[in-house]
């Protein structure tokens, strides 16, 4: 029975029908899976030599870097892999916003759950080196979460970031990637259940098998991203690292500016430009909820016809503003909290939510035309 199941899965993967006109934008999911696997592999090796205790955490990282054979390589590959995971995730979501992936709500929602787990896992992992920036970043974020009763005390093991905090963060950082891996398999199952989308946004009978045609496209993309991954891990990770995080924690000295990793900057800009910490936290949660709400603009009984592409002008304009506002918040997040950047941040927060809600409401109101879909079916039958 097991042998039959393996053969059935193998035949499905080899003969999986894919649209003829998909391009390199459909390569990001495969690349995400490869980089995520490298993250888990390097993370397991690093966890075997890491000591989750505030007196030894920083020195265990230095031991891995300086004394362990190839330890620096594993540590830098793990740090670079985190950036690549979020870069590919943002590109993957961007492709989904442009090319009708929202019309597969199960795949879209499961993918966003994976994205949320990535955010939590990356933040927890950022605290583990126990550098100056790690400690103060954890202090700021946990203070923001203090508006939720009992959560901070349960998460930190007390009222401040201390030894129980780093122990709990280490355990969560080790477990959450495997939880995300389980949801990745569910995400792939839903994708294969409905089939892949294509740039035109409508179902087509012109399909080709995954092997060897599209597998060669995935291998080509993997070669390109792996070269970038190695170059960044070996040569580019030190210049991009924040120097304050290479300093042992000093609880009496605050850094000039608390700067998280670049993939947190849009959410950090929302927190930084809103004076109330509770309101800032609600806005961050609302920004994630807005992505979930976009999955509501679909109808499983209709055929997708050139929807959610840049050709649909009444849809593309607010969606372009939605994406541009997100990347503007990314830039504002790395700036000093001056009045001009706070003003720009609030304006782009308004633009982010208004354009996203306008795209949701306007597109849902104007594109549920069941009669036109019926006419398309009749025309095809003729």
UniProtKB/Swiss-Prot annotation:
The keyword Protein transport does not apply. It comes from the Eukaryota. GO terms for biological process: mitochondrial electron transport, ubiquinol to cytochrome c. Pfam families: Cytochrom_B_C, Cytochrome_B. One of its GO terms (molecular function) is metal ion binding. Heme b b562 binds at residues 78, 173. It is a multi-pass membrane protein. Belongs to the cytochrome b family. Component of the ubiquinol-cytochrome c reductase complex (complex III or cytochrome b-c1 complex) that is part of the mitochondrial respiratory chain. The b-c1 complex mediates electron transfer from ubiquinol to cytochrome c. Contributes to the generation of a proton gradient across the mitochondrial membrane that is then used for ATP synthesis. This is Cytochrome b. It comes from Plasmodium vivax (strain Salvador I).
